[in-house]
Amino acid sequence: MLEFAKRESARAVTEKRRALEARLEKIKVEEEKQRHATDHPKEARKRRRVDTSSGDPGPEQDDQFILDDYDSDADERMASSKKLSDISGLSTSTLELLERFKEQFSAPVEDEIGHEDDDVKIFYCSRTHSQLSQFSSELRRVKMPSSMPAELSTSDANTDEVQERVKHLTLGSRKNLCINPKVMSLGNAAAINERCLELQQPGIAAEKRCPYLPSKEDEGQILQFRDHTLATIKDIEDMGKLGKRMGICPYYASRSVLKHSENVLLKAQKIVTLPYPLLLQRSARDALDLSIKNHVVIIDEAHNLMDAICNIHSVTIRLSQLQTALLQLTTYAHKHKARLKGKNRSYIAQIIRLVSSIRDHLRSILGQNLPAEGTVDPSDLMAGKGVDQINPYKLSRYLQESKLARKVDGYVEFLKNKNQQSDDKPSSPVLFLVQSFLLSLMNPSAEGRFFYLKCHDDIQLRYMLLDPTNQFREIVEDARAVILAGGTMSPMSDYRNHLFSYIAPSRLDTFSYGHVIPPENLIAHTLVNGVLGSEFDFTYDSRDSEKMILDLGRTVATLCQAIPDGVVAFFPSYDYLSRIVAIWRKPLEGEKGETILSLIEREKSILYEGRDMGPKTDDLLQEYTRTIDSGQGALLLSVVGGKLSEGINFSDKLGRGVLIIGLPFPNIRSAVWQAKIQYVEQKTYNSSSGSEKDRQSIAKAAGKDFYENACMRAVNQCIGRAIRHRNDYAAIVMIDRRYEKANIQGKLPAWIKESMLRRSVRRPASALAADLSNFFSGRSPR
């Protein structure tokens, strides 16, 4: 009897899932028709009246800038009841709506059928939305076998014709998904978040609230949004277009899709894509109500992971910004002092004292004959008068809950408009940045440090996370499995020794696969001596040798003669590239005005990557492509860690050769890197055993390994710019005597090392050029 009941329940669920797939198929067809009719776009399904005013009360009203009464003790008692709303950022009505959906679709039949353990989502995370869009594009080609048992169907129709599609959802931030023009115009992510939440507050008049926010009356539209989202694979741009077409906020509506995915009808083949910050930051996961418990997490481009976690949890502020913040805070406090109640007045005074203390310390550093950069003791930042009486916990909570930054920034904008002051471009609200920094100062991580850096007439203060282990640990411990993937993950030791140092080796699996190209499509070689015999030693003490730099130029010209089409040369830094180019521009003795650059230009046109190119990078790439397509060939002088060293594909004739000049070690003399290595050494020393001498030796080796790994990850990224598909072919030349060291070669990708082993004999530059000519001869250009 029980078996029959279970079978009937399963049959009913299967039929509903088939009906859902049929409905999604109809929507897919409908969307395809809409794409064909882009010249005549259809009206939105639900036309909403959008308030075209500023969204703020009139300028004569001052109430909008007044802080709500704040009682830290009372608010602390209420915190637990408000926690869900505060964390998620949803209005009460929207929370009720989403909770009702969750209850509506959470059928008890799940437990009866026993499918709950099979409800595994895949969270696919990458660095940028463009990379996630590439993944979505590939996902559209995937055809998965159906998880619906055909024997449970009672339909008379041919159920095999109903194909079960991959359930995919793209998540993004408000900044990426907001469709409210007035909110989008704020530009800054923190300001957009604050304004979005403000437009949902109970005290906001109905006509001033965001017209796109889902409400209790929008249940049908949210279901419709869900079906359109799941009908086809959509990237972040598609989600925004869908929200605009339907007149509903895609940020909040997509969260409802995530909640619906707990529903038994959507149990199979669920993939959620999201960028790094939404997964790696606890506050972002809380805001999305995102749980990864017992799910699979895949992180692509994982060579960036450790740096990404540290950067997400780091914040930088300048002295000039602190001074601006102080001016804004004091102006606001003076203007509204009669209307600010006791707690607000007290906390604002505390913030002014704290910011003044930080400002004064930075001024003292700027005025002293100190190095250009160094570490800062947090206690020195809080040494101002009365700062020691501040309760860090209460002030942190006040900063997060009072909306002070939003109120002050709004008042500043109001004054600008009132005085008819306008900037050519909107500036980032400085109070949000100050707030982020103060929160770091109030709650510093044991793995974090503070640094200063003098820059011209200003000085910046940075809180930097040195160790990402604990921030990533919660994800590792919650997830069913964590997969780190990348084309160039080598060297791997940092992941084992630092990111996963607390995990037993038996729980860690590493896989390294060969390249898609056959071995004969790659030639990789080190180059120690130039065509004139100079030894290439680009260490700090030897890299400025003009003789060596001139020989490097002649060698590059020789290699460019042997390598067809496009060659990309990567240098350790912009400063060193400028130094080399300056020497290459000098007339050569006895060469009748000839320069190294003119020798190279006989073979290929030369293009340069600048330090602050920004959007001009695309123009440079287009010029590089046009030059190669014209048959001239081109040499692109670039920098390791620059715009062109990562994320740009130099496939086919755009990258027939990659030259790596020197080893791009980070500046070991910088305060940041000294602190990083010191932290690694101390952590290793504390966890090691044996004699004092052995522990110190192990710690020093760990610091050296960590330093080398940072360099070689950057090198491997540059190498990976060429050879982008199975029919591609290219030459990789690493120019520096240190590339012949076993410890350096051991950190190269396996497919590079295999090619080097086949050509293990050291070759002079002229012989290597001959090898390159033979390699490229007879190959059909692509």
From Swiss-Prot:
The name this protein goes by in its record: ATP-dependent DNA helicase chl1
Single GO biological process annotation from the record: establishment of sister chromatid cohesion
Entry binding sites for [4Fe-4S] cluster: 178, 196, 210, 249
Species, as recorded: Aspergillus fumigatus (strain ATCC MYA-4609 / CBS 101355 / FGSC A1100 / Af293) (Neosartorya fumigata)
Catalyses which reaction(s): Couples ATP hydrolysis with the unwinding of duplex DNA at the replication fork by translocating in the 5'-3' direction. This creates two antiparallel DNA single strands (ssDNA). The leading ssDNA polymer is the template for DNA polymerase III holoenzyme which synthesizes a continuous strand; ATP + H2O = ADP + phosphate + H(+)
Chain segments carrying region Disordered: 23-66
Subcellular location: Nucleus
Gene Ontology molecular functions: ATP binding; ATP hydrolysis activity; DNA binding; DNA helicase activity; iron-sulfur cluster binding; metal ion binding
